Amino acid sequence: MGSKLINVEGGNNQDDNKYNSNNVISINNKVNKNDYFIETNKELKINLNFQNNNIISNIFSNINIYDKISNIFINNKKTYMLKYNNNINEENFFISYFEKKDDNFVPISPWHHIDLKNDDGTYNMIVEITKYNYIKLEIQLREKFNVIKQDKKKGKLRYYHNSIYWNYGALPQTYEYPKHIYQNKSKKNKEALLFTGDNDPLDILDIGSACLKIGQVVPVKILGAFTLIDEGELDWKIIAINKEDKHYEDINSLSDIEKYYPHTLSLLLEWFRSYKMADTKKLNLISKQLYDKKESEDLIMKTHHYYLEFREDVKKLKEEHSKETIKEHDYVNAQNIQFNYDKLNNNDDEPMENNLLEDINITYYKSDSAYKPDLNIWTP
């Protein structure tokens, strides 16, 4: 299928390096070339040159939901705006964020500047991928202002091979810092296998019924979490429900999910166990130790402290004028990804990957004092 652009009601999407720190958008000057269109369907352009034609129907079904959602929103008494730039499904598409200062909107980072928690006890979820979508969008840690862009792998835009059935995103001001090492001890493996986090903000899923908007900041209630080992890295997933869902008041735990959205949890776990099979030919591993609400909130706060520690480590390293670059993981300590995966699956009776949940007990091991933070990650 050839490339075709659809522009719903126009909108100014020229690539003017819109997340340059000098770029401010006036909310009073209506003739400014950066004048912002409030409704998403007047801003979004779509390139229909998809790898999978099923994506097209999903995109259009989502557009119908977007049209009445304002791109200007208030969170914790602060006014924010998100803006779509260029054409979705192209390399130069990105979502940028702004905060209102006096009469202007100034660029901000969704990772650094959006609050993690709200006054009512909810947490803020930054939506990267909407329900039923294939396009793998992600906060870009190494780009200025950490804009959201489509992820790339081997130089090509990345897509899920199967659409995701939940709204997926990240928690601001959290970080799975590879400086911290975790271990798995079991009867099967007498020696401890060591793992580190995946060097990204903490992932979160909304199990609510609605398709949220790409880039939207949504208050959610935490329900639980699970530990995923994805190609040898720890990758925790927080499970939540958005505040506007019709069952928000009814669902307060993982067990409540089954009452109102039957089979959601088992489908969710199976999806994350198998979604990389088309690429890696291997199943991910999920620990049978599911987190309850309190344990999940403790995990969120731990990764928030990791985020603060990372910011402090970056500051110290810059002050020392060091030019050292990141050690992706200290594999002298953390061993080897392939080795860890093979060891976890070394069972004479039955391969671990035949089970939905595995007997993997992940506990904290230690902090690597020699670890250097990645100075390529953008910080204010």
Swiss-Prot record:
Transmembrane segments: none annotated. It catalyses: diphosphate + H2O = 2 phosphate + H(+). Mg(2+) 1 binds at residues 198, 203, 235. Pfam families: Pyrophosphatase. CDD domains: pyrophosphatase. One of its GO terms (biological process) is phosphate-containing compound metabolic process. PANTHER family: INORGANIC PYROPHOSPHATASE (PTHR10286). Belongs to the PPase family. This is Probable inorganic pyrophosphatase. It comes from Plasmodium falciparum (isolate 3D7).
